[in-house]
Amino acid sequence: MYRMQLLSCIALSLALVTNSAPTSSSTKKTQLQLEHLLLDLQMILNGINNYKNPKLTRMLTFKFYMPKKATELKHLQCLEEELKPLEEVLNLAQSKNFHLRPRDLISNINVIVLELKGSETTFMCEYADETATIVEFLNRWITFCQSIISTLT
């Protein structure tokens, strides 16, 4: 009598595990993508902070929108929406002392973000009331990446 219910329960559990549970390889891939995203964001931040940038003061006047909360991969939608303004601000910093290639970095970040959040995301980003400077913006997304990576390990 209970045998049929038990078999149904086992079958449903197996279906759930095989279709929705992340595998160790997908977790590892996600972790690697997040590490690449983290490195790109850190590279931009270091490029802004690690030299005498006469344009830094001007760069700090530009404001970026931050999500009210960023705790899941779907929140990367908010980062994606700010990539174009980020590229425009980074283009201001181009000089002989600043050797980052904003277009390449932003393109890399965009590809990684799309892979991590998925292309079919219909998540609408809910932004905080306060805006952030470029340094605050990068630091918050760096912290986001570190936080997600720590949950995967």
Swiss-Prot record:
Return the GO cellular component terms, semicolon-separated: extracellular region; extracellular space
Q: What is its main location?
A: secreted
Q: Where does the signal sequence lie?
A: 1-20
What is an example of a Pfam family matching this protein? IL2
Task: Identify the InterPro entries for this entry.
Answer: 4_helix_cytokine-like_core (IPR009079), IL-2 (IPR000779), IL-2_CS (IPR030477)
Kindly list the places in or outside the cell where this protein is found, as annotated in its UniProt entry: Secreted
So which residues have sugars stuck on them? Answer: 23
The biological process GO terms on file are: activated T cell proliferation; adaptive immune response; cell adhesion; cell surface receptor signaling pathway via STAT; cell-cell signaling; extrinsic apoptotic signaling pathway in absence of ligand; immune response; interleukin-2-mediated signaling pathway
What disulfide bonds does the UniProt entry report for this chain? 78-125
Which keywords accompany this UniProt record?
Adaptive immunity, Chromosomal rearrangement, Cytokine, Disulfide bond, Glycoprotein, Growth factor, Immunity, Pharmaceutical, Proto-oncogene, Secreted, Signal
Domain of life from the UniProt record: Eukaryota
State the function annotated in the UniProt record: Cytokine produced by activated CD4-positive helper T-cells and to a lesser extend activated CD8-positive T-cells and natural killer (NK) cells that plays pivotal roles in the immune response and tolerance. Binds to a receptor complex composed of either the high-affinity trimeric IL-2R (IL2RA/CD25, IL2RB/CD122 and IL2RG/CD132) or the low-affinity dimeric IL-2R (IL2RB and IL2RG). Interaction with the receptor leads to oligomerization and conformation changes in the IL-2R subunits resulting in downstream signaling starting with phosphorylation of JAK1 and JAK3.
User: Which disorder is recorded?
Assistant: A chromosomal aberration involving IL2 is found in a form of T-cell acute lymphoblastic leukemia (T-ALL). Translocation t(4;16)(q26;p13) with involves TNFRSF17.
Q: Which family does it belong to?
A: Belongs to the IL-2 family.
Q: Please report the name of this protein according to its UniProt entry.
A: Interleukin-2
Which gene produces this protein?
A: IL2
